[in-house]
Amino acid sequence: MKPLGTPLSPDATRVMLLGSGELGKEVLIALQRLGVETIAVDRYDNAPGQQVAHQSHTIAMSDPAALRTLIEAERPDLVVPEIEAIATQTLEALEAEGVVRVIPTARATRLTMDREGIRRLAAETLGLPTSPYRFCDSLAELQAAIDGADGQPAIGYPCIVKPVMSSSGKGQSKIDGPADVQAAWDYAMVGGRVSNGRVIVEGFIDFDYEITQLTVRALGADGQVETHFCDPIGHVQVRGDYVESWQPHPMQPAALALSRHIARTVTDNLGGQGLFGVELFVKGDLVWFSEVSPRPHDTGMVTMITQWQNEFELHARAILGLPVSTALKSPGASAVIYGGVDAPGVVYDGVDEALRVPNSEIRLFGKPESFERRRMGVALVHDADVDVARTQAKLAAGKVKARPA
């Protein structure tokens, strides 16, 4: 990278985020604290990140022509994808043409944009342990994959069905028996980010717990990329959507070592610089790869209260070629604050009560419209005892209520 400049000047270091939700908003703030000029892009106006960026644009980021036009007009030093629904072939072309550098790389963005690319990389190319899986394009194919057909072993019941492209658990469900298959297929069709009718069905792993292993690829003093690991983050998901997380999650040494081996293997292959959220299932000393995001992870919001450098600051530092530290400041936990109502421009009651919970912090994301199950904020609590922090974070989150203005 060139030396950091001054925002809104000819020498500014300019970074464009594609996707400006709550995670992107925190990345933008971290970049601005390092003197970076920021450009926030999203598919709807007044997205959280657009509210804090120097400049903002609203486009369909999956439209190749619109995306190319915007990037060529703005000419940022870095493009940082923060969501999956992006015209990744356009990013690959622009990177190959030398127009822009994509974080971590355009290839990594393409491979992780949907579950098929990254699952085939992890299981078939890298040989990492995963759940058994099939990709299906119809209800009939889904049923055949579960039952076993064409010489393929049956996925069986129970199993998990997900759209190949979705976020926050949308379209994901568990199938316990034949009576659930039709409903799971229908839910996947309405929950995907694109309407291509393709799903992944996975055999169910009876894991003890699941973690996110935040993994940072950053330049060392010698200019070579080094890999850093945050303490493991435990989390609870409901239908694939993050509900609460905590750090550190206790792990046996063998399981922790295997988790980090898997995380290093997949992130080394994806390459580039930045923070990756690697999701893993753990049972005893066995570990299975689930997914990876080449960007800050929703379960990693807990690091805003647990680490000296949170996941957003780590991402910002790493992509700018700056030193990083993954040191833990205090154990802690996070719990989601839901909208609870369907309404635009809500107001929040109970914030004062939430902040009376000892060692608590609240982040309200500023989303312009609330839905009943939309993530509108997060409660954060630090405590020497992680279990206490979890209880207190959920207590604080439950005190914040959105209502129509």
Swiss-Prot record:
<dbReference type="GO" id="GO:0043815">
    <property type="term" value="F:phosphoribosylglycinamide formyltransferase 2 activity"/>
</dbReference>
<dbReference type="InterPro" id="IPR048740">
    <property type="entry name" value="PurT_C"/>
</dbReference>
<dbReference type="InterPro" id="IPR013815">
    <property type="entry name" value="ATP_grasp_subdomain_1"/>
</dbReference>
<protein>
    <recommendedName>
        <fullName>Formate-dependent phosphoribosylglycinamide formyltransferase</fullName>
        <ecNumber>6.3.1.21</ecNumber>
    </recommendedName>
</protein>
<dbReference type="InterPro" id="IPR016185">
    <property type="entry name" value="PreATP-grasp_dom_sf"/>
</dbReference>
<keyword id="KW-0658">Purine biosynthesis</keyword>
<dbReference type="InterPro" id="IPR011054">
    <property type="entry name" value="Rudment_hybrid_motif"/>
</dbReference>
<feature type="binding site">
    <location>
        <position position="162"/>
    </location>
    <ligand>
        <name>ATP</name>
    </ligand>
</feature>
<keyword id="KW-0547">Nucleotide-binding</keyword>
<dbReference type="InterPro" id="IPR005862">
    <property type="entry name" value="PurT"/>
</dbReference>
<feature type="binding site">
    <location>
        <position position="291"/>
    </location>
    <ligand>
        <name>Mg(2+)</name>
    </ligand>
</feature>
<dbReference type="GO" id="GO:0005829">
    <property type="term" value="C:cytosol"/>
</dbReference>
<dbReference type="InterPro" id="IPR011761">
    <property type="entry name" value="ATP-grasp"/>
</dbReference>
<dbReference type="GO" id="GO:0000287">
    <property type="term" value="F:magnesium ion binding"/>
</dbReference>
<feature type="binding site">
    <location>
        <begin position="22"/>
        <end position="23"/>
    </location>
    <ligand>
        <name>N(1)-(5-phospho-beta-D-ribosyl)glycinamide</name>
    </ligand>
</feature>
<feature type="domain" description="ATP-grasp">
    <location>
        <begin position="120"/>
        <end position="320"/>
    </location>
</feature>
<keyword id="KW-0067">ATP-binding</keyword>
<comment type="pathway">
    <text>Purine metabolism; IMP biosynthesis via de novo pathway; N(2)-formyl-N(1)-(5-phospho-D-ribosyl)glycinamide from N(1)-(5-phospho-D-ribosyl)glycinamide (formate route): step 1/1.</text>
</comment>
<feature type="binding site">
    <location>
        <position position="279"/>
    </location>
    <ligand>
        <name>Mg(2+)</name>
    </ligand>
</feature>
<comment type="similarity">
    <text>Belongs to the PurK/PurT family.</text>
</comment>
<dbReference type="GO" id="GO:0006189">
    <property type="term" value="P:'de novo' IMP biosynthetic process"/>
</dbReference>
<feature type="binding site">
    <location>
        <position position="298"/>
    </location>
    <ligand>
        <name>N(1)-(5-phospho-beta-D-ribosyl)glycinamide</name>
    </ligand>
</feature>
<dbReference type="GO" id="GO:0004644">
    <property type="term" value="F:phosphoribosylglycinamide formyltransferase activity"/>
</dbReference>
<feature type="binding site">
    <location>
        <position position="210"/>
    </location>
    <ligand>
        <name>ATP</name>
    </ligand>
</feature>
<feature type="binding site">
    <location>
        <position position="82"/>
    </location>
    <ligand>
        <name>N(1)-(5-phospho-beta-D-ribosyl)glycinamide</name>
    </ligand>
</feature>
<dbReference type="InterPro" id="IPR054350">
    <property type="entry name" value="PurT/PurK_preATP-grasp"/>
</dbReference>
<dbReference type="Pfam" id="PF02222">
    <property type="entry name" value="ATP-grasp"/>
</dbReference>
<feature type="binding site">
    <location>
        <begin position="202"/>
        <end position="205"/>
    </location>
    <ligand>
        <name>ATP</name>
    </ligand>
</feature>
<keyword id="KW-0479">Metal-binding</keyword>
<dbReference type="Pfam" id="PF22660">
    <property type="entry name" value="RS_preATP-grasp-like"/>
</dbReference>
<feature type="binding site">
    <location>
        <position position="367"/>
    </location>
    <ligand>
        <name>N(1)-(5-phospho-beta-D-ribosyl)glycinamide</name>
    </ligand>
</feature>
<keyword id="KW-0436">Ligase</keyword>
<keyword id="KW-0460">Magnesium</keyword>
<feature type="binding site">
    <location>
        <begin position="374"/>
        <end position="375"/>
    </location>
    <ligand>
        <name>N(1)-(5-phospho-beta-D-ribosyl)glycinamide</name>
    </ligand>
</feature>
<comment type="function">
    <text>Involved in the de novo purine biosynthesis. Catalyzes the transfer of formate to 5-phospho-ribosyl-glycinamide (GAR), producing 5-phospho-ribosyl-N-formylglycinamide (FGAR). Formate is provided by PurU via hydrolysis of 10-formyl-tetrahydrofolate.</text>
</comment>
<feature type="binding site">
    <location>
        <begin position="167"/>
        <end position="172"/>
    </location>
    <ligand>
        <name>ATP</name>
    </ligand>
</feature>
<comment type="subunit">
    <text>Homodimer.</text>
</comment>
<dbReference type="InterPro" id="IPR003135">
    <property type="entry name" value="ATP-grasp_carboxylate-amine"/>
</dbReference>
<dbReference type="Pfam" id="PF21244">
    <property type="entry name" value="PurT_C"/>
</dbReference>
<feature type="binding site">
    <location>
        <position position="115"/>
    </location>
    <ligand>
        <name>ATP</name>
    </ligand>
</feature>
<dbReference type="GO" id="GO:0005524">
    <property type="term" value="F:ATP binding"/>
</dbReference>
